């Protein structure tokens, strides 16, 4: 996964007054844990249940569903004899620790396990001697005692619920945090040592319950990787009937030990999630794990509010912390599932029960009122992913030998090519289904998608569905109120009665669905006028087959009679996804129809499977999508939505223009499985621009289109007045870059963890490259002679491989005098800025060129942003290879005069780029093999282990504590970026101020975070993705005592 992050601001907070002392007696014990629960195994009918045996059945070389684990338990007192029972739905999670702002929490930890562990808290303040995490931090003696609690030993951890760690202004009363063991955090957590910590605003609890909340639940979505557990060897010996036959490196064995679970329960076996209809329910959610842990937690039949926005799906990633509120509706048995379609098949679901307790309903009965009736059929088509046969970006034939597109469009004995039989939704005029509605020019861009279903709050949506295909199908809506008969899917446990007829409509059958839009599912006061939603057929394979369409749910009175949004010139719906044709219901038909030797096709062949993964938008690839055209100055709404699996992490970049979403100014929108966004754009420059996914594999695989902005009679000149002017002299310079100049921190870390690990990324071994690579970087010079480089100051030392940190205010014109001192063509282009042309001209080696970036209002902060927002600049000659070769830097744009008027004190600014530099994609790979490999003649560039050794998990181009210069004083105002900060929380703007200590970053993401350090020490800063931690994406930052603050 390619993860970006750029820039932070700190805010000074007041001192805390301790309110209450709270004591928790926590023991670590070892136990046998059953992922299928001790209840009868529940198999889900809507899911491909053959998968359950892969994970739950033991055998000669399979462990099965029971594993030895270490877990946290709560005891009544310091004698550690009497266990306090926890709710059954917590599974193997530790007990809930709760604190209000101002409380002082004492955690008395006793280790009953057979190896050392610790207790490390997120979201509370602690001094170094109570951190519970082991890494090289210059602590000794008493300050080290907390870092490793040996078997049989005890340790006291003292934690403070400071205001700056507590809920922000716009946060809910209680927010989700976590605690876990932190000797080797990924292995400790995989072994079971993880639990919830809930930090509440002062006076928001009543006898440990949040006021005005009837029920609360904590859920962790995780692919628990038992291959990483400290107890793997023991589990093999105990539960495999022929342990000597186990090959731990076997991929199938490893997959059988990845337990797709909610709180440690798989395949719907989590007990105890029960509530009454009309109960006010608070959900605390978090994710943990690895790159595979891309979760979309979907609450069937319900709609929630999170951060004051209306949601039904919550995206969770490793160490993502969320809370959400719902009023339970619709009595019945509903599924809480991960809508990552691979995870759904593998058992990541739970049931929750909404019981009819005869409470009076809070919702208006709008059934049958303001009916909008749609007639939709599912039918077969032959779909061509690129009708022109041409790559609109390179002008090459899509089957050109050696092109990136050839793998997907080649047709032959065992290749299907670019056309597939698919199923699609299409709209008809009436219930006879004889006259299909023609799509007008404004709908041309919809492509493979079904018709737009539009509704306002107060409406009833009636959909008469006719199945013209040969498979049972349905329509399942997202974001409206449904009952069990109209849900469009079925997943109840075996033996619970026949499925409702709307859950699967037989071939040639017809069913009329009825859904309602009460105000409780409509936009909140913070939401846009229309919420982007979707509908699809209710089986995982159906979506990949093509059955998905857009829906929008709008405020009352906001739509015209034809369903278009008032006061908007254009509306576009985009569905970026990797259509996995291997999962299509029609795969066998496509093999027979399009391959010339179908009997020779091996459906398990990796190259064959890859050729069928179509990286598309609305079913179009490589710029073949029609209809994305608008006029300069138009008011444009973009509705984006996605579905799929863990590869469907999208950073959708709109070149040439910016948009507003939830008050924030951006040009790159992040999408995940079953998420949707509404974006507002007013294009201000005529030309042809790109809309593309910045996830590297998706971009090269064809997930990119063109959109056109025409003058339409408008004046083309830029009338904005640019009063400020800045000039920067930037060169592209080739350097030798060392990702790990010192191995001292890394080796000390492994010594402290008592592990003797080799490093596939940094060790050269026989033919690997090691830690040094030839790269190209942006560097600043004093003037146009490019003779004297600008020396980096102490506060810029942290930038590492990044180019200079450039600054501009709204109203500025920025002149970039760029000299290419490298050996191949490069350029420099920034996100967010306005340029005269949509084309970025390459600069040849030895040449100098001027690039002009204008900073109009639409390049600056939105009303929901921090005053200064980060953008990124890089070379676009070959966006992928240029980036991985090293060309990237930060641009900070502030509101006009912000730094002069509002911020007279100079803040520290830290820009951090979290990126897996894939050196296999560098222009200099061959040079690096020749220069740094001990045996270049033995190198096989296609060897998987060699390729993996060149994926450098770095922060600003440094690994394992090698990033220098992150130093600040207590009370400093600082600008920072990162994923998880030990010791401190930060604030971030999201149309209001929120607090966390973990921030999620995705392709093309930049975010300003604000933090005021309070606690001196050397603290860990790292990515919380398991593989990234082990691969070295971690460093430390230093908080020095403020000499002006007197001790005590």
Swiss-Prot record:
GO terms of molecular function: copper ion binding; ferroxidase activity; glutathione peroxidase activity; oxidoreductase activity, acting on metal ions, oxygen as acceptor; phospholipid-hydroperoxide glutathione peroxidase activity
Catalytic reaction equation(s): 4 Fe(2+) + O2 + 4 H(+) = 4 Fe(3+) + 2 H2O; 4 Cu(+) + O2 + 4 H(+) = 4 Cu(2+) + 2 H2O; a hydroperoxide + 2 glutathione = an alcohol + glutathione disulfide + H2O; 4 nitric oxide + O2 + 2 H2O = 4 nitrite + 4 H(+)
Glycosylation sites: 138, 227, 556, 582, 756, 920
Keyword Signal in record: yes
UniProt keyword annotations, A-Z: Calcium, Disulfide bond, Glycoprotein, Metal-binding, Oxidoreductase, Phosphoprotein, Repeat, Secreted, Signal, Sodium
Residues bound to Cu(2+) 1: 120, 980
Residue positions binding Cu(2+) 2: 122, 180, 1024
Keyword match Thylakoid: no
Modified residues (Phosphoserine): 716
Domain Plastocyanin-like residue range list: 20-200, 209-357, 370-554, 564-712, 724-894, 902-1044
Binding site for Cu(2+) 6: 977, 1023, 1028, 1033
Cofactor remark: Binds 6 Cu(2+) cations per monomer.
Family stated for the protein in its record: Belongs to the multicopper oxidase family.
Record function comment: Multifunctional blue, copper-binding (6-7 atoms per molecule) glycoprotein. It has ferroxidase activity oxidizing Fe(2+) to Fe(3+) without releasing radical oxygen species. It is involved in iron transport across the cell membrane. Copper ions provide a large number of enzymatic activites. Oxidizes highly toxic ferrous ions to the ferric state for further incorporation onto apo-transferrins, catalyzes Cu(+) oxidation and promotes the oxidation of biogenic amines such as norepinephrin and serotonin.
Protein name from the UniProt record: Ceruloplasmin
Organism for this UniProt entry: Ovis aries (Sheep)
